[in-house]
Every structure is written in structure tokens, then in C-alpha cells.
Regions:
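Transmembrane signal-anchor helices characteristic of membrane glycosylation enzymes that use polyprenol
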Residues: 12-41, 223-236
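Short helix- or helix-capping micro-motifs
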Residues: 21-27, 132-140, 164, 185-189, ...
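Short acidic/glycine- and proline-prone juxtamembrane loop motifs at membrane-interface regions
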Residues: 39, 141-155, 191
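Extracytosolic helix-loop segments that constitute the early lumenal/periplasmic catalytic or substrate-binding loops
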Residues: 40-72, 79, 87
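Loop-to-helix entry region of an early transmembrane alpha helix in multi-pass inner-membrane enzymes
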Residues: 74, 78-85, 90-111, 133, ...
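Transmembrane-helix signature of polytopic, membrane-embedded enzymes
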Residues: 95, 111-138, 156-157, 173-179
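Transmembrane-helix motifs of polytopic, lipid-linked glycan transferases
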Residues: 100-123, 161-165
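Membrane-interface transmembrane helices that cradle and orient dolichyl/undecaprenyl
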Residues: 123-126, 162-178, 188, 206-210
């Protein structure tokens, strides 16, 4: 009897999560077609072209004699540039390439709604969680962002995923959850350097209010550091600085 009830509730939750994802995709696909970017522009075009042609994350630089140099990128976090570069490996060209990126962002945004629902259930009832998840799915900026060549959708997805695993870690404290929190935290630092502060505050919160052991806190910091270490090493070699 207990197992039957458990499976019924589990199937019902999967059904709700699936509907949230499908609903969110249904809302976003027309926006991608109507308002989606037509191509890579400005710094994204330069960075991706240099990754494709020279296998280096760099900007073009012209000196006074109009000689062209590649100037390695320092000030822009690298993750989103590599994200859009990844889709170029499928030999897609023109609008097909751009649409693939935008649809992938729409999918990530839709999945983030389902994850947001699971986080909401920690604090609210199922009805309230479903209502605020639908509102979140329909939030105009969240809908529009997936139609642009911008890191917002990827950042939102990873941030929500981070907090989902963070709350799971506070409750269960397993090594696997330590790894997920650390790795996703590292990816977010590679996407937005300001996330260092959020990661630090989150770990401080877990340490003070939930008595998470110092060993686990240090392990999270270590794995996060390992995640971002290739970029740090590259900056030290090229610029003799870590940022």
C-alpha cells in the first residue's frame, strides 16, 4: 500500500514537471522565431570566430600599421563563449547555427522552471509552488532572454540548479551532492565572476545555520577551484594575474 502511494505520488510529480517543461517550451518557441537574434554580434562573433579559426579565446587587435594580432580575452568570463562555440562543432551554418543555440537556451530555461518548482516545494505547498513556477515561466525577461545571444538563460539555469543541489546538500550531505554544488559553483564563476561572493555567502550560511562540517566546506571550495583552474592557469601564463 505504501509503495503504491509512493509510486502514485512520484508519477504525479513527474507529470507536473513534464507539463511545466512543455508549457515553458511552448511559450518560448514563438518568441525565438519572432524576436530571436539573427546572428552573432560584436564580442561574441569575434570570440567564437577566433576559437574556430585559431583555437584561442581572443579578440582581434590592429596596431597603427593595421597589422592584426590576437589579444587573449581577459575581462569576459569564458563559459558562454565556449557554450556557443560548442554548437559550431556540429557543422551548422548561418541561421541554423543561431537557431540551435536559441532553442537550446529555450530548453534550459524550460528545465529551470521545473527545477524552480522542486525548490519551491521545500518552502511552500504544491499548489503555491505550481502557481509561482508558472509565474516564473511567464516572467517577460525570462521568456525573452532565451531568444538572445546572451548568457542570461545559461546563468539562470545554472543558478537555479546550484541552489537546488545546495538545499539537497544541506539535507542529505552526501559526497555526490558536494561534487554537484562545487562543480556547478565553479561553472557559475566561469560565467559570472561575481558568483564568488554568492558561493562564499552560501557556504557561510550552511556552516553557521546548518552546522555543515568545515571539511565539507573546504572540499566544496577545493573542487570549485579545480573546476576553474584551467582558466586561472591560462590567465597566469598569459597575463601574470588570476582575473
Amino acid at each position: 500500500m505504501f509503495l503504491d502511494n509512493y509510486h502514485h505520488l512520484k508519477n504525479k510529480e513527474i507529470y507536473v514537471l513534464t507539463l511545466l517543461i512543455l508549457f515553458s517550451i511552448f511559450i518560448r518557441v514563438p518568441v525565438v522565431f519572432l524576436y530571436g537574434d539573427a546572428g552573432l554580434e560584436n564580442e561574441w562573433r569575434i570570440l567564437v570566430n577566433n576559437l574556430i579559426n585559431h583555437e584561442i579565446l581572443a579578440f582581434d587587435y590592429h596596431d597603427g600599421n593595421l597589422a592584426e594580432f590576437l589579444f587573449p580575452n581577459l575581462y569576459m568570463p569564458p563559459l558562454y563563449a565556449y557554450y556557443i562555440y560548442f554548437f559550431s562543432t556540429f557543422s551548422l551554418e548561418g541561421q541554423n547555427y543561431i537557431l540551435t543555440i536559441l532553442f537550446s537556451q529555450a530548453l534550459l530555461a524550460s528545465i529551470s522552471v521545473a527545477i524552480f518548482y522542486k525548490i519551491s516545494k521545500i518552502f511552500f505547498s504544491k499548489t503555491i509552488s505550481l502557481s509561482i513556477s508558472l509565474l516564473y515561466s511567464l516572467f517577460p525577461l525570462h521568456v525573452y532572454a532565451c531568444s538572445q545571444i546572451s548568457s542570461i538563460s545559461l546563468q539562470t539555469f545554472l543558478t537555479i540548479l546550484f541552489f537546488y543541489f545546495f538545499f539537497q546538500f544541506i539535507e542529505k550531505r552526501s559526497f555526490l551532492l558536494v561534487f554537484f554544488v562545487s562543480f556547478i559553483g565553479g561553472l557559475l564563476i566561469l560565467l559570472r565572476q561575481e558568483f564568488v561572493a554568492i558561493l562564499a555567502l552560501s557556504l557561510l550560511y550552511a556552516f553557521i545555520f546548518y552546522k555543515i562540517s568545515l571539511k565539507k566546506i573546504l572540499l566544496i571550495l577545493l573542487i570549485s577551484l579545480i573546476t576553474i583552474s584551467p582558466y586561472l592557469i591560462r590567465n597566469i601564463i598569459v597575463f601574470e594575474t588570476v582575473t
